[in-house]
Amino acid sequence: MSLSLDDVKRVANLARIEISEDEARKALIQLSGIFGLIEQMQAVDVSAITPMSHAQDVMQRLRADGATEIDQRELFQSVAPQVEAGLYLVPKVIE
């Protein structure tokens, strides 16, 4: 993908970034290098490689899924300014 100096300036403008001519040239060189690396990676034939979710085929040991805290709903609602049917009542902010 070819990138021009005008493209860099336009993206900087869209991002609301003030960029000088010298900074735009430096950014163009850096972005062109990044796009070059991406093009190299896209050129690699990976059709014969099986997709994997992790580098090592191991199972992760997980802890038992259980409640670790006690229910404090009543305590929290006792200090709330307004509660009705277990719900917190708040002032209407949007008409």
UniProtKB/Swiss-Prot annotation:
Gene3D superfamilies: Glu-tRNAGln amidotransferase C subunit, N-terminal domain
E.C. designation(s): 6.3.5.-
GO MF, one annotated term: asparaginyl-tRNA synthase (glutamine-hydrolyzing) activity
Single GO BP term: glutaminyl-tRNAGln biosynthesis via transamidation
PANTHER family reported in the protein's UniProt record: GLUTAMYL-TRNA(GLN) AMIDOTRANSFERASE SUBUNIT C, MITOCHONDRIAL
HAMAP family: GatC
Protein family per UniProt: Belongs to the GatC family.
Subunit structure: Heterotrimer of A, B and C subunits.
Name of the featured protein: Aspartyl/glutamyl-tRNA(Asn/Gln) amidotransferase subunit C
Organism: Nitrosospira multiformis (strain ATCC 25196 / NCIMB 11849 / C 71)
Gene: gatC
